[in-house]
Amino acid sequence: MKPYLISDLEIISAGAEGKAIGKVDGLVVFVPFVVPGDVVDVEVYKKKKGYAEARLVAIKSYSPHRVDTQCPHFGLCGGCKWQALDYQQQLLYKQQQVEDNFAHLGKFDFPPLQPILASENIFYYRNKLEYTFSNLRWLDDEDMTLQKNGKTIEPRGLGFHIPGKFDKVLDIKHCALQEDPSNELRNRVKEYAIAQNLSFYNIRNHEGLLRNIVIRTSSTGEIMVIVVFTEKSEKTMSLMQFIKDEFPQITSLQYVINTKLNDSITDLEVHLYSGKDFIVDTMEDLTFKIGPVSFYQTNSQQAYRLYSIAREFAQISSEDVVYDLYTGTGTIANFVARQAKKVVGIEYVDAAIEDAKINSEYNKIKNTVFYAGDMKDVLNRDFICQNGTPNIVITDPPRAGMHATVIDRLLEMEPKRIVYISCNPATQARDITLLDAKYKVEKVQPVDMFPHTQHVENVALLVKR
């Protein structure tokens, strides 16, 4: 279709994927990087039955809920699409998202939602970021102007993928999501690599030495850096030595050789260059070892509050057998173990289960057991006979929710309480509907884990009827 202009579109709500919503002549228009209350001119570039997608052309009048953004890349980077929206308004829309999903997609009664738990830090809250090297840097308007005027533009960049452009990377100057030394480290590594003429990866033809850099931090002050190369060479090892020399505060410096077409490193060997091969984080009196490919909630401070809510909802006693479904690296299982008789954790990823066992051992917790495998296959009658019928189940499935077989097994086991943690209230509402015959929703607590994004976590307490 040929793009066309809509003038004076009033933005009335926040919608899916972090986009905002306007309406004109019965057509719903999705626009990124604007906020409810703005009046804007937009260019429609995609139109389907009942809705259209548009890009911002001009803001005609500003919403009272619009705030100044901290990020110099806002409007290009897709990471923090709600950053221009006042944080209290963000919370209202996230709360409404849970309410709407439960009301419209669920077929069950539920009590009034508890007020959403805000994040204490709305900037610099992430403990992990991954940046991509690319020799196809996204050129912004300023770059294009300089190029037209005959200036040579550096094509290499280190940053985040541009939304919708698989082969383009936005070169990041400053990211307000992770505390220092994240920004300084990323910028210094890029400068060194360019000065030494190290080749940046080209995702189209799969050439270039430098692929990714992962930076992990912890509440204890420890720092892990993992650099991903396509080969080990004198040049790549010189970069590792540069990082070690320039950033002595790094406690775990590692590298990976990845010659695959995709960026995943979970199935690859991680090589230790200096320091330890892990960092540690703490919650209460527990210490968690985090390896290079370990899953760990990226907002540590808010994760502690989320797990505290789950533990409070569960009301675990010393006689309770607890099943922790989709346990990941066993963080929740270990967090609640001291209140329980026994905790059984199940997770699909083998490496995560090994981390879970290590963390139990590290904290001298002896009443946990962990199993790896597909939940719908592992959680069978023989498994329950072997491990005991649970009194309490804590479940934290991926965005797709729980498999119908798992829900059927929950209905068979009939635990007295189910604590359902979800990063997708839509699939959570679907699953709770299937559990409604035997369980009523007693409490609902939304939690904001990711400020400036549309994502919301939700904890629901289900009690046996």
How does the language model describe each region?
Residues 1-73, 369, 377:
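Terminal RNA-binding accessory module
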Residues 2-8, 16-17, 233-465:
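Rossmann-like S-adenosyl-L-methionine
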Residues 20-25, 158-162, 228, 356:
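Short, acidic/hydrophobic/Gly-rich beta-strand patch recurrent on exposed beta strands
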Residues 58-69, 75-199:
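Extended interfacial segments that mediate partner engagement and assembly in macromolecular machines
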Residues 114-121, 203-204, 210-212, 446-449:
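Short, solvent-exposed loop/turn elements at beta->coil junctions and helix N-caps
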Residues 167-203, 207-209, 217, 231-254:
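Internal alpha/beta scaffold segment
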Residues 215, 221-230, 287-291:
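Short, aliphatic-rich beta-strand segments
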